[in-house]
Amino acid sequence: MGSSILTNRSAMTALQTLRNIDNNLDKSKDRISTGLRIGSASDNTAYWSISSMMKHDSNTMSAVVDAINLGREQVNVAATAVNLTKESLDDIQKSMVSAREKSDDDIMKIQDSIKGNMQNISNAIQSAAFGGKNILSNGGEKVGIAAGYRREGSAVYVDMIEVGGAELNFGVMGPDGTIDMTQGILKGVFGKSDKDIDAGIKTFTEAADKQKGLEDALAKAEAAVAANPNDEAAKTALEEAKKAVEDNKEDWTKAQSDFKVVADSMTLNDFVQMQGVGGLPSVAQSIILNSVQKTVRHAVDVTLTAGSKIGSAVNQVDSQLNFVKRLLDNIEAGIGALVDADMNAESAKLSALQVQQQLGIPRLFLLQIRAARIF
Protein backbone atom coordinates (compact mmCIF):
# COMPACT_ATOMS: atom_id res chain seq x y z
CA MET A 1 0.00 0.00 0.00
CA GLY A 2 1.38 3.41 -0.89
CA SER A 3 1.90 6.23 1.50
CA SER A 4 -0.76 8.87 1.97
CA ILE A 5 -0.16 12.46 2.91
CA LEU A 6 -3.49 12.43 4.77
CA THR A 7 -3.44 9.10 6.60
CA ASN A 8 -0.55 7.21 8.17
CA ARG A 9 -2.23 3.81 8.49
CA SER A 10 0.79 2.10 10.04
CA ALA A 11 1.01 4.75 12.73
CA MET A 12 -2.73 4.46 13.39
CA THR A 13 -2.44 0.69 13.79
CA ALA A 14 0.52 1.07 16.11
CA LEU A 15 -1.35 3.71 18.09
CA GLN A 16 -4.41 1.46 18.44
CA THR A 17 -2.20 -1.39 19.58
CA LEU A 18 -0.56 0.90 22.10
CA ARG A 19 -3.97 2.02 23.35
CA ASN A 20 -5.04 -1.60 23.80
CA ILE A 21 -1.83 -2.29 25.69
CA ASP A 22 -2.43 0.74 27.92
CA ASN A 23 -6.03 -0.34 28.52
CA ASN A 24 -5.00 -3.89 29.41
CA LEU A 25 -2.20 -2.51 31.54
CA ASP A 26 -4.66 -0.36 33.49
CA LYS A 27 -6.93 -3.38 34.00
CA SER A 28 -4.04 -5.52 35.17
CA LYS A 29 -2.85 -2.85 37.60
CA ASP A 30 -6.40 -2.47 38.91
CA ARG A 31 -6.71 -6.23 39.45
CA ILE A 32 -3.40 -6.32 41.30
CA SER A 33 -4.29 -3.32 43.48
CA THR A 34 -7.79 -4.60 44.34
CA GLY A 35 -7.08 -8.32 44.18
CA LEU A 36 -10.23 -8.74 42.08
CA ARG A 37 -10.66 -9.86 38.50
CA ILE A 38 -14.41 -9.11 38.65
CA GLY A 39 -14.76 -5.69 40.23
CA SER A 40 -17.91 -4.49 38.51
CA ALA A 41 -20.77 -5.74 36.39
CA SER A 42 -18.93 -4.68 33.23
CA ASP A 43 -16.20 -7.24 33.91
CA ASN A 44 -18.60 -10.21 33.89
CA THR A 45 -22.30 -9.63 34.46
CA ALA A 46 -23.16 -13.18 35.54
CA TYR A 47 -20.20 -13.60 37.92
CA TRP A 48 -20.69 -10.13 39.36
CA SER A 49 -24.40 -10.77 40.02
CA ILE A 50 -23.79 -14.15 41.67
CA SER A 51 -20.89 -12.87 43.77
CA SER A 52 -22.87 -9.81 44.87
CA MET A 53 -25.67 -12.04 46.13
CA MET A 54 -23.14 -14.28 47.87
CA LYS A 55 -21.50 -11.22 49.48
CA HIS A 56 -24.91 -10.17 50.79
CA ASP A 57 -25.39 -13.66 52.22
CA SER A 58 -21.90 -13.52 53.72
CA ASN A 59 -22.59 -10.19 55.45
CA THR A 60 -25.89 -11.50 56.78
CA MET A 61 -24.21 -14.71 57.94
CA SER A 62 -21.57 -12.67 59.77
CA ALA A 63 -24.35 -10.88 61.63
CA VAL A 64 -25.87 -14.28 62.46
CA VAL A 65 -22.51 -15.42 63.87
CA ASP A 66 -22.47 -12.34 66.12
CA ALA A 67 -26.04 -13.09 67.23
CA ILE A 68 -25.16 -16.73 67.95
CA ASN A 69 -22.13 -15.63 69.98
CA LEU A 70 -24.39 -13.35 72.02
CA GLY A 71 -26.89 -16.17 72.53
CA ARG A 72 -24.06 -18.53 73.44
CA GLU A 73 -22.96 -16.24 76.25
CA GLN A 74 -26.56 -15.94 77.47
CA VAL A 75 -26.77 -19.73 77.68
CA ASN A 76 -23.33 -20.03 79.31
CA VAL A 77 -24.26 -17.48 81.98
CA ALA A 78 -27.46 -19.42 82.69
CA ALA A 79 -25.49 -22.68 82.89
CA THR A 80 -23.08 -21.11 85.40
CA ALA A 81 -26.01 -19.94 87.55
CA VAL A 82 -27.57 -23.42 87.50
CA ASN A 83 -24.25 -24.99 88.55
CA LEU A 84 -23.90 -22.53 91.44
CA THR A 85 -27.48 -23.33 92.47
CA LYS A 86 -26.68 -27.04 92.53
CA GLU A 87 -23.59 -26.43 94.69
CA SER A 88 -25.60 -24.35 97.18
CA LEU A 89 -28.32 -27.01 97.37
CA ASP A 90 -25.65 -29.64 98.06
CA ASP A 91 -24.45 -27.54 101.00
CA ILE A 92 -28.03 -27.20 102.23
CA GLN A 93 -28.47 -30.98 102.09
CA LYS A 94 -25.39 -31.46 104.24
CA SER A 95 -26.70 -28.91 106.74
CA MET A 96 -30.06 -30.67 106.97
CA VAL A 97 -28.40 -34.00 107.69
CA SER A 98 -26.36 -32.45 110.49
CA ALA A 99 -29.45 -30.83 112.06
CA ARG A 100 -30.70 -34.03 113.70
CA GLU A 101 -30.47 -34.35 117.47
CA LYS A 102 -28.95 -30.90 117.81
CA SER A 103 -29.59 -28.24 120.43
CA ASP A 104 -31.70 -25.23 119.62
CA ASP A 105 -28.59 -23.02 119.37
CA ASP A 106 -26.95 -25.43 116.92
CA ILE A 107 -30.09 -25.60 114.80
CA MET A 108 -30.25 -21.81 114.68
CA LYS A 109 -26.67 -21.77 113.33
CA ILE A 110 -27.67 -24.33 110.71
CA GLN A 111 -30.68 -22.20 109.77
CA ASP A 112 -28.40 -19.17 109.31
CA SER A 113 -26.08 -21.22 107.09
CA ILE A 114 -29.03 -22.35 104.98
CA LYS A 115 -30.23 -18.74 104.67
CA GLY A 116 -26.81 -17.82 103.28
CA ASN A 117 -26.99 -20.58 100.68
CA MET A 118 -30.52 -19.54 99.73
CA GLN A 119 -29.26 -16.00 99.20
CA ASN A 120 -26.45 -17.36 97.03
CA ILE A 121 -29.01 -19.16 94.87
CA SER A 122 -31.14 -16.04 94.57
CA ASN A 123 -28.11 -13.93 93.63
CA ALA A 124 -26.99 -16.48 91.02
CA ILE A 125 -30.39 -16.54 89.31
CA GLN A 126 -30.69 -12.76 89.54
CA SER A 127 -27.25 -12.32 87.95
CA ALA A 128 -27.90 -14.75 85.09
CA ALA A 129 -28.96 -11.90 82.79
CA PHE A 130 -26.88 -11.19 79.69
CA GLY A 131 -27.71 -8.94 76.80
CA GLY A 132 -30.99 -7.94 78.41
CA LYS A 133 -32.24 -11.52 78.72
CA ASN A 134 -32.39 -13.92 81.64
CA ILE A 135 -33.26 -17.43 80.48
CA LEU A 136 -33.84 -18.57 84.07
CA SER A 137 -36.33 -15.89 85.11
CA ASN A 138 -38.55 -15.85 82.06
CA GLY A 139 -41.58 -17.43 83.68
CA GLY A 140 -41.03 -20.64 81.72
CA GLU A 141 -41.19 -18.92 78.34
CA LYS A 142 -38.58 -19.91 75.80
CA VAL A 143 -35.92 -17.49 74.55
CA GLY A 144 -35.07 -17.53 70.86
CA ILE A 145 -31.41 -17.53 69.82
CA ALA A 146 -30.43 -16.94 66.18
CA ALA A 147 -29.08 -20.17 64.73
CA GLY A 148 -28.73 -19.71 61.00
CA TYR A 149 -29.65 -17.90 57.80
CA ARG A 150 -30.85 -19.49 54.60
CA ARG A 151 -32.22 -18.39 51.26
CA GLU A 152 -34.80 -20.46 49.42
CA GLY A 153 -35.64 -18.85 46.11
CA SER A 154 -36.81 -15.33 46.84
CA ALA A 155 -37.61 -16.18 50.48
CA VAL A 156 -35.13 -15.58 53.29
CA TYR A 157 -35.29 -17.35 56.66
CA VAL A 158 -33.49 -16.89 59.97
CA ASP A 159 -33.57 -20.13 61.95
CA MET A 160 -33.83 -20.00 65.73
CA ILE A 161 -32.82 -22.22 68.66
CA GLU A 162 -35.33 -22.06 71.50
CA VAL A 163 -33.91 -22.26 75.03
CA GLY A 164 -35.98 -22.29 78.21
CA GLY A 165 -39.29 -23.84 79.15
CA ALA A 166 -40.74 -25.20 82.37
CA GLU A 167 -37.55 -27.06 83.35
CA LEU A 168 -35.60 -23.78 83.41
CA ASN A 169 -38.27 -21.68 85.11
CA PHE A 170 -36.51 -20.53 88.27
CA GLY A 171 -38.75 -17.52 88.74
CA VAL A 172 -40.56 -14.56 87.28
CA MET A 173 -39.04 -11.11 86.86
CA GLY A 174 -41.09 -8.53 88.72
CA PRO A 175 -41.69 -4.91 87.72
CA ASP A 176 -39.12 -3.77 90.28
CA GLY A 177 -36.41 -5.89 88.65
CA THR A 178 -36.34 -8.57 91.34
CA ILE A 179 -37.08 -12.23 90.66
CA ASP A 180 -39.99 -13.93 92.38
CA MET A 181 -38.47 -17.35 93.13
CA THR A 182 -41.72 -18.59 94.68
CA GLN A 183 -43.18 -19.07 91.19
CA GLY A 184 -40.37 -21.22 89.85
CA ILE A 185 -39.13 -24.78 90.13
CA LEU A 186 -37.56 -23.95 93.52
CA LYS A 187 -40.84 -22.83 95.09
CA GLY A 188 -40.30 -25.60 97.66
CA VAL A 189 -37.19 -23.69 98.73
CA PHE A 190 -38.36 -20.09 98.52
CA GLY A 191 -42.14 -20.41 98.84
CA LYS A 192 -44.41 -20.48 101.87
CA SER A 193 -46.70 -23.15 103.27
CA ASP A 194 -50.44 -22.80 102.84
CA LYS A 195 -50.95 -24.39 106.28
CA ASP A 196 -50.95 -22.81 109.73
CA ILE A 197 -47.62 -24.24 110.85
CA ASP A 198 -47.64 -22.70 114.33
CA ALA A 199 -51.09 -24.10 115.07
CA GLY A 200 -50.05 -27.48 113.72
CA ILE A 201 -46.95 -27.56 115.90
CA LYS A 202 -48.95 -26.53 118.98
CA THR A 203 -51.58 -29.23 118.42
CA PHE A 204 -49.02 -31.91 117.74
CA THR A 205 -46.83 -30.91 120.69
CA GLU A 206 -49.84 -31.31 123.00
CA ALA A 207 -50.57 -34.73 121.52
CA ALA A 208 -46.91 -35.73 121.79
CA ASP A 209 -46.73 -34.59 125.41
CA LYS A 210 -49.87 -36.61 126.21
CA GLN A 211 -48.45 -39.71 124.49
CA LYS A 212 -45.14 -39.30 126.28
CA GLY A 213 -46.96 -38.98 129.61
CA LEU A 214 -48.88 -42.20 128.95
CA GLU A 215 -45.73 -44.03 127.85
CA ASP A 216 -43.85 -42.79 130.92
CA ALA A 217 -46.72 -43.98 133.16
CA LEU A 218 -46.64 -47.38 131.44
CA ALA A 219 -42.90 -47.66 131.90
CA LYS A 220 -43.25 -46.74 135.59
CA ALA A 221 -46.03 -49.32 136.08
CA GLU A 222 -43.96 -52.02 134.36
CA ALA A 223 -41.04 -51.20 136.63
CA ALA A 224 -43.28 -51.44 139.72
CA VAL A 225 -44.56 -54.90 138.74
CA ALA A 226 -41.06 -56.05 137.90
CA ALA A 227 -39.93 -54.95 141.36
CA ASN A 228 -42.87 -56.61 143.16
CA PRO A 229 -44.60 -59.26 140.99
CA ASN A 230 -47.11 -60.14 143.73
CA ASP A 231 -48.36 -56.57 144.23
CA GLU A 232 -51.96 -56.66 142.97
CA ALA A 233 -52.29 -52.90 143.05
CA ALA A 234 -49.19 -52.57 140.85
CA LYS A 235 -50.64 -55.13 138.44
CA THR A 236 -53.90 -53.23 138.27
CA ALA A 237 -52.04 -49.97 137.65
CA LEU A 238 -50.07 -51.66 134.84
CA GLU A 239 -53.23 -52.88 133.13
CA GLU A 240 -54.75 -49.41 133.38
CA ALA A 241 -51.57 -47.86 131.92
CA LYS A 242 -51.59 -50.33 129.02
CA LYS A 243 -55.25 -49.58 128.35
CA ALA A 244 -54.61 -45.84 128.41
CA VAL A 245 -51.83 -46.20 125.83
CA GLU A 246 -54.04 -48.44 123.68
CA ASP A 247 -57.01 -46.09 123.94
CA ASN A 248 -54.81 -43.18 122.83
CA LYS A 249 -53.29 -45.11 119.94
CA GLU A 250 -55.83 -43.96 117.36
CA ASP A 251 -55.61 -40.33 118.45
CA TRP A 252 -51.81 -40.46 118.44
CA THR A 253 -51.69 -42.00 114.97
CA LYS A 254 -54.06 -39.35 113.67
CA ALA A 255 -52.04 -36.58 115.32
CA GLN A 256 -48.87 -37.83 113.60
CA SER A 257 -50.64 -38.12 110.26
CA ASP A 258 -52.14 -34.64 110.54
CA PHE A 259 -48.81 -33.12 111.52
CA LYS A 260 -47.04 -34.87 108.65
CA VAL A 261 -49.46 -33.13 106.27
CA VAL A 262 -48.48 -29.80 107.83
CA ALA A 263 -44.77 -30.65 107.74
CA ASP A 264 -44.94 -31.79 104.11
CA SER A 265 -46.39 -28.41 103.18
CA MET A 266 -43.42 -26.63 104.74
CA THR A 267 -40.84 -25.02 102.48
CA LEU A 268 -37.18 -24.58 103.25
CA ASN A 269 -37.95 -20.91 103.75
CA ASP A 270 -40.54 -21.84 106.40
CA PHE A 271 -37.97 -24.01 108.16
CA VAL A 272 -35.27 -21.34 108.38
CA GLN A 273 -37.83 -18.89 109.80
CA MET A 274 -38.93 -21.28 112.57
CA GLN A 275 -37.82 -20.62 116.11
CA GLY A 276 -37.32 -23.13 118.88
CA VAL A 277 -36.99 -26.16 116.60
CA GLY A 278 -34.48 -27.71 118.97
CA GLY A 279 -36.96 -27.46 121.82
CA LEU A 280 -39.71 -29.42 120.07
CA PRO A 281 -40.42 -33.06 120.94
CA SER A 282 -37.94 -35.32 119.14
CA VAL A 283 -40.73 -36.94 117.12
CA ALA A 284 -41.84 -33.49 115.90
CA GLN A 285 -38.26 -32.60 114.97
CA SER A 286 -37.91 -35.86 113.06
CA ILE A 287 -41.11 -35.32 111.06
CA ILE A 288 -40.14 -31.73 110.22
CA LEU A 289 -36.57 -32.60 109.19
CA ASN A 290 -37.71 -35.58 107.10
CA SER A 291 -40.21 -33.43 105.22
CA VAL A 292 -37.80 -30.55 104.63
CA GLN A 293 -35.06 -32.94 103.52
CA LYS A 294 -37.49 -34.42 100.99
CA THR A 295 -38.19 -30.90 99.73
CA VAL A 296 -34.47 -30.20 99.34
CA ARG A 297 -33.93 -33.50 97.50
CA HIS A 298 -36.70 -32.52 95.09
CA ALA A 299 -35.02 -29.14 94.59
CA VAL A 300 -31.75 -30.92 93.78
CA ASP A 301 -33.55 -33.20 91.30
CA VAL A 302 -35.22 -30.36 89.39
CA THR A 303 -31.94 -28.42 89.39
CA LEU A 304 -30.15 -31.44 87.91
CA THR A 305 -32.83 -31.58 85.23
CA ALA A 306 -32.32 -27.87 84.57
CA GLY A 307 -28.56 -28.44 84.37
CA SER A 308 -29.06 -31.21 81.84
CA LYS A 309 -31.40 -29.01 79.81
CA ILE A 310 -29.09 -26.00 79.78
CA GLY A 311 -26.08 -28.24 79.07
CA SER A 312 -27.82 -29.61 75.99
CA ALA A 313 -28.56 -26.04 74.90
CA VAL A 314 -24.89 -25.08 75.30
CA ASN A 315 -23.83 -28.01 73.12
CA GLN A 316 -26.49 -27.21 70.53
CA VAL A 317 -25.49 -23.55 70.29
CA ASP A 318 -21.77 -24.42 70.11
CA SER A 319 -22.42 -26.95 67.37
CA GLN A 320 -24.53 -24.49 65.39
CA LEU A 321 -21.92 -21.76 65.81
CA ASN A 322 -19.20 -24.02 64.41
CA PHE A 323 -21.44 -25.03 61.52
CA VAL A 324 -22.32 -21.44 60.59
CA LYS A 325 -18.64 -20.44 60.76
CA ARG A 326 -17.72 -23.27 58.39
CA LEU A 327 -20.60 -22.29 56.11
CA LEU A 328 -19.38 -18.69 56.13
CA ASP A 329 -15.87 -19.86 55.20
CA ASN A 330 -17.34 -21.84 52.29
CA ILE A 331 -19.26 -18.81 51.05
CA GLU A 332 -16.14 -16.65 51.25
CA ALA A 333 -14.21 -19.31 49.32
CA GLY A 334 -16.97 -19.41 46.70
CA ILE A 335 -16.87 -15.64 46.29
CA GLY A 336 -13.11 -15.78 45.93
CA ALA A 337 -13.35 -18.44 43.25
CA LEU A 338 -15.67 -16.19 41.24
CA VAL A 339 -14.05 -12.77 41.55
CA ASP A 340 -10.54 -13.02 43.00
CA ALA A 341 -7.62 -12.36 40.69
CA ASP A 342 -4.77 -14.83 40.23
CA MET A 343 -2.00 -12.62 41.54
CA ASN A 344 0.80 -14.71 40.02
CA ALA A 345 -0.83 -14.65 36.60
CA GLU A 346 -1.65 -10.94 36.84
CA SER A 347 1.92 -10.10 37.86
CA ALA A 348 3.30 -11.99 34.87
CA LYS A 349 0.74 -10.36 32.60
CA LEU A 350 1.62 -6.91 33.96
CA SER A 351 5.30 -7.47 33.26
CA ALA A 352 4.54 -8.58 29.70
CA LEU A 353 2.28 -5.59 29.06
CA GLN A 354 4.91 -3.19 30.42
CA VAL A 355 7.46 -4.66 28.00
CA GLN A 356 4.95 -4.34 25.13
CA GLN A 357 4.33 -0.73 26.11
CA GLN A 358 8.03 0.02 26.21
CA LEU A 359 8.49 -1.48 22.74
CA GLY A 360 5.33 0.07 21.29
CA ILE A 361 6.24 3.70 21.98
CA PRO A 362 9.57 3.69 20.02
CA ARG A 363 7.88 1.84 17.13
CA LEU A 364 5.18 4.51 16.91
CA PHE A 365 7.91 7.19 16.99
CA LEU A 366 9.78 5.49 14.10
CA LEU A 367 6.61 5.26 12.00
CA GLN A 368 6.02 8.96 12.53
CA ILE A 369 9.59 9.76 11.42
CA ARG A 370 9.22 7.58 8.30
CA ALA A 371 6.04 9.43 7.34
CA ALA A 372 7.77 12.77 7.83
CA ARG A 373 10.49 11.86 5.31
CA ILE A 374 7.96 11.87 2.49
CA PHE A 375 8.07 15.63 2.72
From Swiss-Prot:
GO terms for cellular component: bacterial-type flagellum; extracellular region. It holds the Pfam family Flagellin_N. It comes from the Bacteria. One of its GO terms (molecular function) is structural molecule activity. InterPro entries: Flagellin, Flagellin_C, Flagellin_N. Keywords: Bacterial flagellum, Secreted. Its main location: secreted. The keyword Flavoprotein does not apply. It is found in: Secreted; Bacterial flagellum. Belongs to the bacterial flagellin family. PANTHER family: FLAGELLIN (PTHR42792:SF2). Flagellin is the subunit protein which polymerizes to form the filaments of bacterial flagella. Flagella are an important component in the invasiveness of B.bacilliformis. This is Flagellin. It comes from Bartonella bacilliformis.
